[in-house]
Regions:
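Bacterial Sec-dependent N-terminal signal peptides
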Residues: 1-25
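Preference for extracellular/luminal or secreted protein segments
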Residues: 21-195
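Short, gly/Ser/Thr-rich active-site loops of penicillin-recognizing serine hydrolases
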Residues: 23-26, 59-61, 146-147, 180-186, ...
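Coil residues (strongly favoring Ser/Thr
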Residues: 41, 96-97, 202, 208, ...
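Short, conserved catalytic-motif segment at the N-terminal edge
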Residues: 198-259, 280-282, 449, 560
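Short active-site loop at a secondary-structure junction
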Residues: 216-225, 245-309, 369-383, 459-462
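Short, surface-exposed loop or secondary-structure junction motifs
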Residues: 299-527
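Short, surface-exposed beta-strand/loop micro-motifs that present aromatic residues
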Residues: 535-548
């Protein structure tokens, strides 16, 4: 079945193109011959999308979990932008012609073609796997692409150009990052601010704030991503992993950060909302009725809504690690070993294993901790100790495997999860601290939070590691009302409820699990929700402005006592620049 779509976002209706009066392909060819910047780049990107030809029943790819996604260059030609951007959508495994036997029928093979003639000769006589095959053909008209490669697959994306604009557009088309006249985009797209009702000149002011953030010593490295109207329009990073320390390297766009308390809303809270949707819990349930372990304790009558909004009277936290070190901050031998055994099972960092019974100690001290009954707001990590246990109780899986199978893998957040060293090299993870008060080492790839570290890095309040791209996908899922990539995760009304100011009338500005703008905030829209993290992270989602703002840094390196980030208001200043860049009036 033939499918040819002329892609365009609705926003382009407000951005007249010369191509409207003539041939879009000729206009695109003409534009590529000139130096392009700012608003012109947005127009050319739109032309690239408009002139892309798409054929085949398997485009866009929806299910990212059925099997692996492989990528092969059909010949020697490299397609750097295409290869970069398909990796933004999913984990991609490179494969050569000699390795095609690795692919099974559940997998997907994407073949990149820069030169149709060379590629045709290169593929001749090769036995291709019996799986979904998608070809991205550049430098060839649609008719030639179909004639040359139609015997290989029905699924062909083609462009007459090899320019990076076309390569990005092809990646978007394959994974559903573009809309057409028949269907909306199902995943984030990539482009320029003017394609999303924003000003490139205004948004570029963030660059100077990024430099100032690093050069002031607020954090060694920082990454900011802004998405609006379903399109990533700003995605830049600055700085290094460890400042001037030996072994430091420049940060890049794929770096993985310790998300700290952003874990609460990007790992644990989705399952609390799901339990609510499924009728397994109600907001006015008492904790002891939902979790029998709290029966007979001073927490049994706490309402779930009060726990979610941090007004249940829970203690803020307990510095458990202080109970396991001596007066010189050295680990006490009864609590630690340098190698694991059946007793010392909790790895807190390389060469340091805590006694396994500490897990029960942490739980017992949390259960027995004092409470207050005045309904005052006290931000508490214990709330999400509880909700992690609740999710695991109902779903019968550890939280770290639950988020992978039910959230991150299907959504395409392939670089997210707990304990990243199990999947990625240490060099791809920014360090969180040169820690000198407990573990006495550079903490890199192990959770910074001390309580989560005792729990093998997995907790409801901390432990998630992620990238700006992956946090944008999760945020867009929330902004879409609970759907992403053609799959529904939550209902819109559930997200509306949990992100609302539930106890506004009683002076509490928090959402149900989500953070929200304080009553004095003059930057964010009133319906904005998200969370910040101790390590220097922030995720904010504004439904009214249709905007996602991601800020990632390792401000705790080399010391968690570094407060320059908050004193300099860098996160807020960048967010204010995002709102100032909006040109289509939808700021509130």
């Amino acid at each position: 079945m033939k499918r040819i779509s002329k892609y365009a976002l609705a926003i382009t209706l407000a951005m007249p193109l010369c191509a409207a009066a003539g041939n879009p392909q000729k206009e695109y060819d003409r534009a590529l011959k000139h130096e392009i910047s700012g608003q012109d780049s947005a127009k050319v990107m739109t032309l690239a999308e408009n002139t892309l030809s798409v054929n085949g029943p398997d485009i866009p790819l929806e299910d990212l979990t059925a099997g692996k996604i492989f990528y092969m260059r059909a010949a020697s030609g490299v397609l750097p932008s295409f290869e970069k951007y398909i990796r933004k959508y999913a984990g991609i495994t490179p494969v050569s012609k000699a390795e095609l036997g690795r692919i099974n029928h559940k997998d997907v093979l994407i073949i990149g073609v820069r030169d149709a003639k060379d590629a045709s000769a290169s593929l001749r006589g090769i036995s291709l796997p019996e799986c979904k095959i998608i070809m991205a053909v550049f430098g060839a008209k649609e008719r030639k692409a179909r004639k040359t490669f139609g015997h290989v697959t029905e699924n062909i994306v083609s462009s007459e150009n090899t320019a990076f604009f076309s390569q990005i557009a092809a990646a978007e088309a394959i994974f559903g990052g573009l809309s057409d006249e028949n269907s909306p985009a199902i995943r984030l797209g990539y482009g320029y601010p003017e394609q999303a009702g924003m000003s490139s000149d205004s948004l570029s002011k963030i660059d100077a704030i990024l430099r100032e953030t690093v050069e002031s010593g607020a954090a060694p490295g920082v990454h900011v991503l802004v998405a609006r109207h379903g399109r990533v329009v700003y995605d830049r990073w600055y700085g290094t992993t460890m400042g001037s320390m030996d072994g430091s390297a420049r940060v890049d766009g794929d770096m993985i950060y310790d998300m700290a308390s952003v874990t609460k809303v990007m790992a644990t809270l989705p399952f609390v909302m799901k339990l609510y949707e499924e009728g397994k819990i109600k907001l006015d349930d008492r904790l002891g009725d939902v979790m029998p372990k709290f029966k007979g304790t001073n927490k049994e009558d706490m309402l779930l809504s009060d726990i979610l909004t941090h007004r249940a009277g829970l203690k803020a936290w307990i510095p458990y690690y202080l109970q396991t070190i001596d007066s010189t901050t050295r680990p006490l031998p009864q609590y630690y070993r340098t190698v694991p055994d059946s007793i010392f099972t909790q790895k807190v960092v390389d060469g340091m294993y805590a006694i396994g019974s500490i897990v029960d100690t942490i739980d017992r001290q949390m259960i027995e901790s004092p409470v207050t009954d005045d309904k005052k707001y006290v931000y508490s990590d214990f709330a999400f100790f509880i909700f992690r246990q609740m999710a695991e109780q109902f779903y019968g899986q550890p939280l770290d495997s639950l988020v992978q199978s039910e959230l991150y893998r299907p959504i395409g957040a392939w670089r997210s999860g707990y304990n990243p060293l199990e999947r990625f090299p240490q060099s791809e993870i920014v360090p969180s601290e040169n820690e000198k008060y407990w573990r006495h080492t550079v903490v890199r790839g192990y959770v910074h939070d001390m309580a989560a570290a005792f729990l093998n890095g997995v907790s409801g309040h901390a432990g998630l590691f992620s990238t700006a791209d992956d946090m944008a996908k999760m945020s867009q899922m929330y902004l879409n009302g609970g759907s992403y990539g053609g799959r529904r995760y939550l209902r819109p009304e559930t997200i509306d409820l949990f992100s609302s100011c539930y106890y506004c009338d009683q002076g509490n500005y928090r959402g149900l699990g989500f953070d929200r703008p304080s009553f004095s905030n003059k930057i964010m829209g009133p319906k904005t929700f998200g969370h910040t993290g101790f390590t220097g992270t922030a995720v904010w989602i504004d439904p009214q402005a249709d905007m996602v703002y991601i800020f990632l840094s390792n401000r705790t390196f080399d010391s968690m006592n570094n407060n320059i980030l908050s004193r300099g208001n860098f996160r807020s200043r960048i967010q204010a620049a995002c709102y100032s860049a909006i040109t289509d009036g939808a700021k509130e």
